[in-house]
Amino acid sequence: MKTLLLTLVVVTIVCLDLGYTLTCCNQQSSQPKTTTDCADNSCYKMTWRDHRGTRIERGCGCPQVKPGIKLECCKTNECNN
């Protein structure tokens, strides 16, 4: 009986994937790819143009942006690359 109970607990933990974190890219513009683990359930990629050219910012979450900034939010690992 104890073995069955232990098996059910292990299966439940594996199926629920407790403690899951999303991996988001967080490099800026044309920098080499870097990632970070995020507790948020989404990643973002912001794109805009300034006097230096096209700028890109990546990170965790889905922030509100000003007009003129393109925002893409997504919910899978490294989806904002």
From Swiss-Prot:
Gene Ontology cellular component list: extracellular region
InterPro entries associated with the record: Snake_3FTx, Snake_toxin-like_sf, Snake_toxin_con_site, Toxin_cobra-type
Upper lineage: Eukaryota, Metazoa, Chordata, Craniata, Vertebrata
Tissue: Expressed by the venom gland.
SUPFAM superfamilies to which the protein is assigned, alphabetical: Snake toxin-like
UniProt source species: Aipysurus laevis
Signal peptide range in chain numbering: 1-21
Alphabetical list of Gene3D superfamilies matching this protein: CD59 (2.10.60.10)
Taxonomy, superkingdom: Eukaryota
GO molecular function annotations of the record: acetylcholine receptor inhibitor activity; ion channel regulator activity; toxin activity
Places the protein is found: Secreted
Protein name from the UniProt record: Short neurotoxin B
Keywords (A to Z) from UniProt: Acetylcholine receptor inhibiting toxin, Disulfide bond, Ion channel impairing toxin, Neurotoxin, Postsynaptic neurotoxin, Secreted, Signal, Toxin
A Pfam family matched in the record: Toxin_cobra-type
